[in-house]
């Protein structure tokens, strides 16, 4: 949370910064690590379920803050601690330069994908060589940052709407912490001095 609040406040381009949470403890942490520019919005318990989508929460924030349709809504999930203020600025610049309805962060990955049948038979999604360096990289949506026009978000109820533009990020910026292995990777990044806020 502290990294996300610091990046948002450090960007200098966001008119309002809000943390939406159903936890009073998370709200206290957000307030404690803020310079005073971040407001905490405590969510209704109905928006605190495992099935609650990011878009449901964002629509609640749009309504509570009465944001106009032309507002650029920047979504910064706290599970991406290595996203700095400069990355937020790059995403906003791309959004404005292109006249986008949305911008998302993407990572270039070489993947060997397929599906497994009930009898354990593997079927590749497409033919591929054994060596990873010969695989054509794909661009994968990374939840590090989304920028969405408020009106388009209200209309489509999605953070990614057309026309959408992609901001390519590196593996450290895109490190998303969801499980114990991700924590180990984050600790290694910090220990090696690979993240400069």
Please tell me what each predicted stretch does.
Residues 1-20:
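N-terminal glycine-rich phosphate-binding loop and ensuing alpha1 helix
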Residues 15-17, 72, 101:
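Residues at the starts of beta-strands that form the adenosine-phosphate
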Residues 21-24, 108:
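Residues in the short beta-alpha loop(s) of Rossmann-like NAD(P)-binding domains
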Residues 24-72, 83-86, 90:
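Short phosphate-binding loop-to-helix
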Residues 27, 150-154, 183:
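A generic structural signal for short hydrophobic patches within well-formed alpha-helices
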Residues 50, 54-60, 69, 80-170:
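Conserved core of the sugar-phosphate nucleotidyltransferase
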Residues 76-77:
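Active-site acidic Asp-centered loop
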Residues 168, 173-197:
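Hydrophobic helical membrane-anchoring modules
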